């Protein structure tokens, strides 16, 4: 029996060593062992909120995920915590708002991202239930393949001396190299990353229809916010003209949004007690899309996002 235990102990040594490395290098700071993390993943941000529940939160997809929180605070005079993450659907954002309301009874304010893209009924990702299970169960995190791959990537970058977090959504575009299609030689009027973006989102937008069930759920959550004294602001972030002219107008989305959806949203805002800030259709910022947009949905984090940050958060004072 003693020999068996010794053999088992020896077998467990490499496993224990691996998980020690995992704890040291996992980039999401799940266990709170690191002072800071630059991870923008959903698990990282939700776990940080569990450890320190802020009174003002930002909920949305990637267009609201890259704010400089110091600049947010300067413009609004308030302290914010971001829970926004890439690819978040309207359902996931509703789930997240419900979760925040449950987690923090002292919540004061929430910014909620919405757009024609997340309103699309076919864009209905559903990951919040899995996230909640992972938040509650450390072993689910430890044995999750994706998070282990993330750790190994972070470890590899550390060993190579590569700065974690990547280069960000920004570019100093050079003509003609960054304006030319490498396959056809065609020269675009805007930089290539922006020029090809409409084609990337076009397939998902072809059968566009409003997700009325999730929109009604948002209104119910707005009622809960109003009853609890939580200020809710629904924000439609700006998009580039290329998306408007090459996707929204040809597919009839623009007409539906401006003629039906937005008037209904304004009525709902009055009825359910939330504020509505529309930078996607009504108050489109006069940005130079070639320099201030990284792609069709995302403002350049150096040349466009800071300007919109000041506009948005000044409106939230």
Language-model segments: which ranges?
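Short extracytoplasmic
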Residues: 41-68
């Amino acid at each position: 029996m003693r020999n068996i235990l010794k053999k088992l102990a020896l077998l467990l040594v490499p496993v224990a060593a691996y998980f020690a490395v995992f704890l040291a290098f996992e980039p999401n700071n799940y266990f709170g062992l690191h002072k800071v993390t630059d991870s923008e993943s959903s698990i990282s941000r939700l776990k940080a909120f569990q450890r320190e529940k802020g009174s003002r939160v930002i909920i949305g997809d990637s267009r609201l995920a890259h704010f400089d929180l110091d600049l947010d605070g300067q413009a609004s005079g308030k302290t914010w915590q971001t829970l926004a993450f890439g690819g978040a659907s309207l359902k996931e954002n509703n789930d997240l708002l419900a979760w925040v309301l449950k987690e923090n009874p002292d919540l004061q304010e929430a910014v909620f991202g919405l757009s024609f893209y997340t309103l699309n009924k076919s864009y209905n990702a559903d990951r919040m239930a899995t996230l909640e299970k992972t938040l509650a169960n450390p072993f689910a995190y430890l044995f999750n393949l994706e998070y282990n791959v993330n750790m190994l990537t972070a470890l590899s970058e550390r060993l190579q001396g590569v700065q974690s977090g990547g280069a960000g959504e920004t570019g100093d575009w050079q003509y003609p190299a960054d304006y030319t299609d490498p396959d056809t030689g065609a020269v675009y009027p805007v930089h290539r990353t922006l020029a090809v973006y409409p084609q990337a989102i076009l397939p998902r937008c072809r059968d566009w229809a409003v997700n009325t069930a999730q929109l009604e759920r948002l209104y119910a959550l707005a009622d809960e916010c109003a009853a609890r004294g939580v200020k809710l602001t629904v924000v439609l972030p700006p998009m580039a003209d290329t998306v408007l002219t090459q996707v929204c107008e040809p597919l009839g989305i623009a007409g539906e949004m401006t003629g039906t959806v937005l008037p209904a949203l304004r009525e709902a805002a009055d009825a359910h007690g939330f504020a509505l800030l529309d930078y996607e259709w009504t108050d489109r910022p006069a940005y130079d899309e070639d320099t201030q947009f990284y792609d069709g949905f995302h403002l350049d984090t150096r040349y466009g996002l800071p300007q919109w940050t000041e506009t948005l958060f000044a409106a939230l004072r």
